[in-house]
């Protein structure tokens, strides 16, 4: 506990009381009364009353400060809440702006699509109008042809009536039938009909050329695939034969080698050759490629050579085995 500061002592008691009275009077705590130190009970009560006033003023000031502090805290809380509300409103505004931008982009896309549809619709209307004109021209030609056909039928009926009437008078008369009116091959063709016929000819020529081109490209691709597969097969056979020759060359260059080494080498060569043949057949069956007759003859010839070499290896192994058997019997 700290020692309180002492302002008054017996040497300055009078000056201290005078200073206190002036200070209390200036602050409005006392009016006419003064602090006096005496044995009078009234002076002591006056001192106690002044102390009570000071305590109450201190309590009121403390309460006022506490209320001000609470008000400040409430203001800070309101300010923080307002800031949070502002942030939330900003986020909602950004989301709304983004949504508006998306809707605007959709509207622009729909407008472009609508413009394209309008253009396509206009083109379809033009095509439909041309088709209607062409159909109208064809109907006109059909009606003309029908009228000509009706005229021909009427002419034939008239000729038949004349012949039938004359038949009773002259049995030797010949049936005279007027030649039907031939359609004029040089008759003018309407512009709509001419353009329609020309368009049909162009479409048919285009389709025929397209079909022929597709068939040619298909055959060309098939031919390239056959060439590629045949080249792969010939390369495989050539590599197999070369590897077999390379493997057999040391065997015939050293005829006086150790029989055990010769037997081991022959076994390795024979196994490698058989594995190569199996791999070749497996690849051939897996790819399911087709070869020409000439290339098939070459493949068969290579297979015969491979069979001959395999027989040579088998005979060599048999000879080495017999040699080893004789050596074992001797020892």
From Swiss-Prot:
Function noted in UniProt: Has a role in meiosis.
Family named by the database record: Belongs to the ADIP family.
Name of the protein: Meiotically up-regulated gene 172 protein
Keyword ATP-binding listed: no
Superkingdom: Eukaryota
Coiled-coil regions listed in the entry: 72-166
Keywords recorded for this protein, A-Z: Coiled coil, Cytoplasm, Meiosis
Protein's cellular compartments: Cytoplasm
GO MF annotation, one: spindle pole body anchor activity
GO biological process: one example: microtubule anchoring at mitotic spindle pole body
GO CC annotation: cytoplasm; mitotic spindle; mitotic spindle pole body; MWP complex; nucleus
């Amino acid at each position: 506990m700290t020692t309180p500061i002492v302002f008054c002592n017996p040497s300055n008691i009078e000056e201290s009381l005078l200073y206190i009275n002036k200070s209390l009077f200036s602050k409005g705590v006392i009016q006419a009364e003064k602090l006096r130190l005496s044995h009078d009970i009234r002076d002591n009560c006056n001192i106690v009353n002044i102390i009570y006033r000071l305590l109450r003023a201190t309590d009121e000031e403390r309460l006022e400060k506490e209320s001000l502090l609470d008000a400040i805290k409430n203001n800070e809380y309101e300010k923080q809440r307002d800031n949070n509300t502002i942030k939330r409103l900003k986020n909602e505004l950004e989301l709304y702006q983004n949504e508006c931008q998306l809707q605007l982009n959709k509207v622009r896309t729909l407008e472009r699509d609508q413009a394209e549809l309008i253009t396509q619709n206009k083109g379809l209307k033009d095509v439909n109008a041309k088709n209607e004109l062409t159909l109208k021209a064809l109907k006109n030609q059909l009606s003309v042809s029908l009228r000509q056909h009706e005229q021909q039928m009427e002419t034939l009926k008239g000729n038949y009536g004349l012949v039938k009437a004359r038949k009773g008078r002259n049995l030797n008369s010949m049936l005279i039938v007027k030649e039907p009116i031939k359609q004029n091959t040089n008759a003018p063709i309407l512009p709509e009909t001419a353009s329609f016929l020309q368009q049909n000819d162009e479409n048919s020529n285009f389709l025929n050329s397209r079909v022929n081109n597709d068939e040619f490209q298909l055959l060309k691709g098939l031919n390239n695939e056959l060439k590629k597969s045949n080249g792969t097969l010939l390369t495989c056979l050539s590599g197999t034969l070369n590897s077999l020759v390379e493997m057999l060359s040391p065997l015939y260059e050293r005829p006086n080698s150790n029989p055990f080494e010769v037997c081991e080498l022959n076994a390795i060569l024979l196994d490698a050759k058989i594995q190569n043949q199996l791999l070749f057949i497996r690849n051939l069956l897996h790819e399911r490629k087709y070869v020409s007759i000439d290339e098939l003859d070459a493949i068969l010839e290579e297979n015969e050579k491979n069979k001959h070499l395999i027989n040579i290896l088998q005979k060599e192994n048999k000879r080495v085995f017999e040699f080893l058997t004789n050596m074992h019997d001797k020892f």
